[in-house]
Amino acid sequence: MTTKVRVAVVGASGRMGRVLIEAAKHQDVITLGAAIERQGSTLIGADAGELAGVGCVNVAICDSLDNVKDDFDVLIDFTSPDASMLHLEWCLRHKKPMVIGTTGFNHAQKEQISACAEQIPVVFSPNMSVGVNLMWKLLEVATAVMGQDTDIEIIEAHHRHKKDAPSGTALKMGEIIANTLGRDLEECAVYGREGITGARDRNTIGFSTIRAGDIVGEHTAMFADIGERIEITHKASSRMTYANGAMRAAFWLYDQNAGLYDMQQVLGLS
């Protein structure tokens, strides 16, 4: 491919939106084609690059995907579950590929994403970081070797503004561990503990959540036995790691057929 893939960023003025715009500015194979904000925003008409602090990129923020449908190839969405579903429906109508980094979807929404992906290409991942996706592969190995004989705990920490808990990344960690052990996460997960809980059931997977300050994202899976424990940890110090992963996903997705993909496939890990 000789031409750059044009991406649209929805939620352009948000924390992640601005980082996505910055990431697009510094990509060799990606260019920013459109930036979208909610109707009524005072930022409509502003230059997206100026908003993100990377200088003028000659892309004005608009309030409707309809107005820029011919200006981009792939939509990138890190907004909210309800907003993402509306954007997905728009992409379905206009046959646009979509990268979804939003977390907090319910079961019905996930089913709808899968259904839409039968007609358009979709990358859907709770975490676009290359490091996190490598961690997920390491979890499979650790679980296969020692998961049956250890107490497994997942600890995650994020900034005080994050709305969903546990994080989508933590839940994905739990799903990988449970699937490797042949268990159902819905049946074996324990979310927090309080009071007199009794002895720990080794067949459970515990989750602990921290919300504090400006923590970008930290995730640890602990495999604890008598006398030793293994901890697999990923710490993000900047949202740029997620944004760069999303750009990589958008470039990869542009040439794909309709289907539901994840970052493991984008990175060639599965």
Curated annotation (Swiss-Prot):
- Stated EC number for the protein is 1.17.1.8
The residues listed in the UniProt record as binding NAD(+), with positions renumbered to this chain, are 11-16, 37, 101-103, 125-128
Going by the UniProt record, its keywords in alphabetical order are: Amino-acid biosynthesis, Cytoplasm, Diaminopimelate biosynthesis, Lysine biosynthesis, NAD, NADP, Oxidoreductase
Enzyme class, broadest EC rank = oxidoreductase
Q: Which residues form the active site?
A: 158 (proton donor/acceptor), 162 (proton donor)
* Subcellular location, principal: cytoplasm
Q: Which GO terms describe its molecular function?
A: 4-hydroxy-tetrahydrodipicolinate reductase; NAD binding; NADP binding; oxidoreductase activity, acting on CH or CH2 groups, NAD or NADP as acceptor
Q: Cite the annotated pathway.
A: Amino-acid biosynthesis; L-lysine biosynthesis via DAP pathway; (S)-tetrahydrodipicolinate from L-aspartate: step 4/4
GO BP, one example?
A: diaminopimelate biosynthetic process
Describe the reaction catalysed, as an equation. (S)-2,3,4,5-tetrahydrodipicolinate + NAD(+) + H2O = (2S,4S)-4-hydroxy-2,3,4,5-tetrahydrodipicolinate + NADH + H(+); (S)-2,3,4,5-tetrahydrodipicolinate + NADP(+) + H2O = (2S,4S)-4-hydroxy-2,3,4,5-tetrahydrodipicolinate + NADPH + H(+)
Of the GO CC terms on this record, one is: cytosol
> What is this protein's function per UniProt?
Catalyzes the conversion of 4-hydroxy-tetrahydrodipicolinate (HTPA) to tetrahydrodipicolinate.
Name-wise, this protein is 4-hydroxy-tetrahydrodipicolinate reductase
Q: Which organism is it from?
A: Shewanella denitrificans (strain OS217 / ATCC BAA-1090 / DSM 15013)
